[in-house]
From Swiss-Prot:
PANTHER family: SSRA-BINDING PROTEIN, TMRNA-BINDING COMPONENT OF TRANS-TRANSLATION TAGGING COMPLEX. It comes from Escherichia coli O6:K15:H31 (strain 536 / UPEC). Pfam families: SmpB. GO terms for biological process: trans-translation. This is SsrA-binding protein. SUPFAM superfamilies: Small protein B (SmpB). One of its GO terms (cellular component) is cytosol. Belongs to the SmpB family. GO terms for molecular function: RNA binding. It is found in: Cytoplasm. Required for rescue of stalled ribosomes mediated by trans-translation. Binds to transfer-messenger RNA (tmRNA), required for stable association of tmRNA with ribosomes. tmRNA and SmpB together mimic tRNA shape, replacing the anticodon stem-loop with SmpB. tmRNA is encoded by the ssrA gene; the 2 termini fold to resemble tRNA(Ala) and it encodes a 'tag peptide', a short internal open reading frame. During trans-translation Ala-aminoacylated tmRNA acts like a tRNA, entering the A-site of stalled ribosomes, displacing the stalled mRNA. Keywords: Cytoplasm, RNA-binding.
Amino acid sequence: MTKKKAHKPGSATIALNKRARHEYFIEEEFEAGLALQGWEVKSLRAGKANISDSYVLLRDGEAFLFGANITPMAVASTHVVCDPTRTRKLLLNQRELDSLYGRVNREGYTVVALSLYWKNAWCKVKIGVAKGKKQHDKRSDIKEREWQVDKARIMKNSHR
């Protein structure tokens, strides 16, 4: 009998929304499943996804992911009409949906997609309840990040 090769998993992350953390204060995060079609799963396995402009819309007691772009592969979708930016239903339990509805109905809160990743064989999306940042908040975050880099450089050079 032949031995199976040890599986060296790469990163389980498919796509990140770095812009969301720059433009919003993320207050709470949820993990949601996605209702996908077959060609979308194959494209996600190939890493052809972009969620930088995506957001979550709550409607009729359900949550939907808008603006996520999953590029179809030519070989995977020959007989199906593919819509790369179609609305995809998020799979959340009722308690999580109620929490999201309560938060979003407050002034200034929105729900954004933070990352798209694999969990076992299932595709999951991490969504966050967020409040928009002002321009001065973004600048202070950049200053803080630069200070952390400078501090690390100073500490590294001080030991020589």
